[in-house]
Every structure is written in structure tokens, then in C-alpha cells.
């Protein structure tokens, strides 16, 4: 392995930092669960979630751009332990190889831009469809973008779907996309913003086209990247 790859491997990890921030911001949820005092959690969600259609009752991006920060802060909040664990596990598994390949700065830019654009598109979607009292939280939009980019570099890698079924990443990506689209179109009231997941895929695709100058779908299925032996995914 060359010195450049060694430097990237041993240097500061932005993926680890993102995971730490998400876990720290989950502490109010833990305190609420243990003490049954939801005051801190309520404040965190009131100011940190991307709130849509609440009128003037709580801080909301509807009420002015001064609350636009919610497009960012909502990416670091999670509604329950499973939500946090699944997102952070996926971020670690799929994000680490991308950070090693791109470098921390490029990975952070990709993660934040894709996540924020997915939130902006979700805000417009819910606003234009007349949705009321919607609070968006979670890193899923950005994480779905990470999954798409990972698939472009490592399409043949197998993962265990539901920790049971072995499936190549290049088939997992379209399976997730079809599933999210189906759930969104059938109007499932499961409390999950499936449209945000789809926007994560879309903006990751656009980001790869514009910034990295490659088509992730073409690379995934028609012209796979030849991965150097020293850079194989582990």
C-alpha cells in the first residue's frame, strides 16, 4: 500500500466525527427514556428538526429563512434507537471506504450537500402537497446518497439484507429505490419520509455527475471501476 493511502487510512476520520455528533445529540432521547422527562428532547426537536406546516406555533422554516439552519441540524437527530443504529451502521460500513478514496473534505462536502438538498426537496414536496405538522429528522437522505456512491465503486460487494439474505450492492440499490417509491406512492402512514430517501439517491447521482464527473449507474452496471488490490473494501 502506498504512503498516500496509508496517510488517508491513519488520518482523522470525518465519518467517525459524524457518528459521534449523532450519538451525542441522541442523549436527550436517552434521558427522556430513563427519567421520563422530555423537556430537553422537546427543545431539541422543536429547534433542531425540519418543521413544516406548523404555522407560528413552533420555530419552522415556514416562518422565515432564519430557521433555515434546520435543513442541517435535522440531519443529526433521530427519533429512536433503531433509527440511529441503522443509519450510523450504514454510514460507517459504506462511508468509510468512500472517505478513504475521496479524502475527508470531499466526503464531508458530499454528505452535507446531498443531505441538505434532500431536505430542501422534501420541504418543497411537503409544502406543495399541503402537508401539515411534519417534522423531518434523520440522516437517511445523506446515507442513501452514500449507499449509491458506494455501489458505484464496489458494485459486486455482497451485504446481508435483513442480516440474512446475501445480495450484491448493485442489486440492493435499485431494490431500495423501488421499495421507497412503492411505499411513497401507496401513501403508507408509517411515519417515515420515504421521499427524502429517494431524494438522497437523486442528489447523490447528480453530485457524482457534476463534481466527480462519473455516472454512478453506468459505473455500477456497465463499466465498473477496476479497484486496486490495495484499496479493496474490507
What is each of the regions a protein language model found here?
Residues 125-135, 161, 184-192:
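Membrane-interface helix caps and helix-loop-helix hairpins in membrane proteins
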Residues 37-76:
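Extracytosolic (periplasmic/ER-lumenal) interhelical loops and adjacent juxtamembrane/interface segments
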Residues 16-30, 87-148, 169-180:
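Small-polar-interrupted transmembrane alpha-helices in polytopic inner-membrane proteins
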Residues 2-5, 91-100, 154-161:
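C-terminal ends of transmembrane helices
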Residues 82-91, 137-148, 190-212:
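Alpha-helical transmembrane segments that form the membrane-embedded catalytic/substrate-binding core
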Amino acid at each position: 500500500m502506498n504512503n498516500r493511502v496509508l496517510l488517508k487510512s491513519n488520518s482523522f476520520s470525518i465519518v467517525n466525527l459524524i457518528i459521534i455528533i449523532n450519538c451525542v445529540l441522541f442523549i436527550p432521547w436517552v434521558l427522556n427514556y430513563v427519567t421520563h422527562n422530555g423537556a430537553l428532547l422537546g427543545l431539541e426537536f422543536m429547534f433542531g428538526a425540519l418543521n413544516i406546516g406548523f404555522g407560528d406555533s413552533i420555530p419552522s422554516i415556514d416562518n422565515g429563512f432564519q430557521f433555515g439552519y434546520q435543513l442541517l441540524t435535522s440531519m443529526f437527530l433521530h427519533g429512536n434507537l433503531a433509527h440511529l443504529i441503522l443509519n450510523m451502521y450504514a454510514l460507517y460500513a459504506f462511508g468509510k471506504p468512500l472517505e478513504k478514496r475521496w479524502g475527508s473534505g470531499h466526503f464531508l462536502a458530499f454528505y452535507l450537500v446531498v443531505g441538505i438538498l434532500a431536505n430542501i426537496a422534501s420541504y418543497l414536496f411537503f409544502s406543495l402537497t399541503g402537508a401539515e405538522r411534519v417534522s423531518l429528522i434523520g440522516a437517511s437522505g445523506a446515507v442513501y446518497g452514500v449507499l449509491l456512491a458506494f455501489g458505484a465503486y464496489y458494485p459486486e460487494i455482497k451485504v446481508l439484507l435483513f442480516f440474512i439474505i446475501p445480495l450484491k450492492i448493485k442489486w440492493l440499490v435499485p431494490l431500495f429505490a423501488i421499495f421507497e417509491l412503492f411505499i411513497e406512492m401507496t401513501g403508507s402512514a408509517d411515519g417515515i419520509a420515504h421521499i427524502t430517501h429517494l431524494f438522497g439517491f437523486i442528489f447523490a447521482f447528480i453530485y457524482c455527475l457534476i463534481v466527480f464527473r462519473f455516472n454512478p449507474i453506468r459505473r455500477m452496471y456497465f463499466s465498473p471501476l477496476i479497484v486496486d488490490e490495495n484499496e479493496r473494501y474490507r
